[in-house]
A protein has these predicted regions:
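Short, structured segments at the rim of ligand-binding sites
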Residues: 1-317
Length: 317
């Protein structure tokens, strides 16, 4: 099939060249229609030969996963050569596991989404007296998801996970632990190289809880649905936090900024930015998010779930 692949103006800014270069190397006929390295692209259909291909692994694991998934249709098996440090490595492992399961006649088990659960862990950090029950998750030691690390990360911060069978977990905050993390004179540092999707929820809730932080190995967050480092710095400034970012880190050292009475957050058309700042309403009591409907990309029922735990949500047209 011949055709044009295009997307929203926001996603047009995401670099696509590592994937296009890899596909061209195995016979794909792809042409950039506007900016070199970014969508839209024109694809002329044809059979791909497969075989050895090199791909830059330092921008997004999605390029690797895409090649792995479609390689079953190629004439020759795929042999991937990865350049640079692999970011979001657990997603590559998850793709590998899925392909292995597809060789089995039994139906694969589809887990609940740990990255989506991170926003409710964030809520419990901000409202430690209220428990939250989440279903459909697999215990971290059984899960194929790297983002299952959220349970250990939040345990350190003071949110405990109490399992009731393999699939249902009750979250509750431990004020003593939360207060001890808040009183630390140096920032809590986490390496987020394998779990970048957890950064927005963690950054917003830790700042609102008064816990200083420094997240490293986050350079690939500049190439998500938005430049998430820049988006977090800008929007967290609106709620009073002087956040610093660099090539490969984002941090908050406790410094505060003046905050306006009416907070209007731009979602940057990024579902994780919208969800992270929605949770902030638990502490700020009132917040407006422009473009909040973008949460439908990964969590269509998000606002409905927030209503269940007491949020009042109003759509402004």
């Amino acid at each position: 099939l011949d055709g044009i692949v295009d997307c929203s103006p926001q996603l047009r800014r995401r670099p696509l060249s590592p994937l296009v270069d890899a596909l061209r190397a195995i016979g794909a006929d792809i042409e950039y229609l506007e900016e070199e390295g970014c969508p839209p692209i024109y694809i002329k259909g044809g059979k791909l030969k497969g075989g050895e291909v090199a791909v830059d692994a330092g921008i997004s694991s999605q390029f690797i996963s895409a090649l792995m998934l479609v390689s079953r249709l190629w004439a020759s098996p795929l042999s991937l050569g990865l350049r640079g440090e692999i970011v979001s490595r657990p997603y590559v492992e998850m793709t590998k596991r899925l392909l292995e399961m597809s060789d089995d006649d039994s139906a694969p088990y589809i887990e609940g989404d740990w990255s989506a659960a991170s926003f409710f862990y964030a809520y419990c950090l901000l409202v430690p007296d209220k428990d939250v029950r989440i279903g459909l998750l697999r215990k971290p030691d059984l899960s194929v998801q790297g983002d299952a690390a959220v349970a250990d990360i939040f345990k350190y911060l003071g949110v405990e996970s109490e399992w009731e069978g393999d699939g249902e977990v009750v979250l509750h905050g431990n004020r003593h632990v939360i207060d001890s993390r808040r009183s630390m004179s140096v920032p809590v540092e986490f390496d987020m190289g394998d779990v970048p999707d957890l950064v927005p929820a963690l950054a917003v809730c830790m700042a609102l809880a008064g816990i200083r932080f420094r997240f490293i190995k986050v350079s690939h967050l500049r190439h998500k649905e938005s430049d998430r480092l820049s988006a977090l710095q800008t929007e967290m400034g609106k709620i009073g936090f002087a956040v610093e970012t660099g090539d490969d880190f984002i941090s908050w050292d406790g410094r505060r900024l003046p905050m306006s009475k009416e907070v209007i957050i731009e979602s940057h058309e990024d579902h994780r930015i919208a969800m992270a700042f929605s949770i902030a309403a638990a502490k700020l009591h009132h917040i407006t998010i422009r473009g909040g409907e973008c949460v439908s990309k990964s969590f269509p029922g998000f606002y409905g779930e927030l209503r269940k735990i007491g949020f009042v949500i109003r759509i402004i047209y």
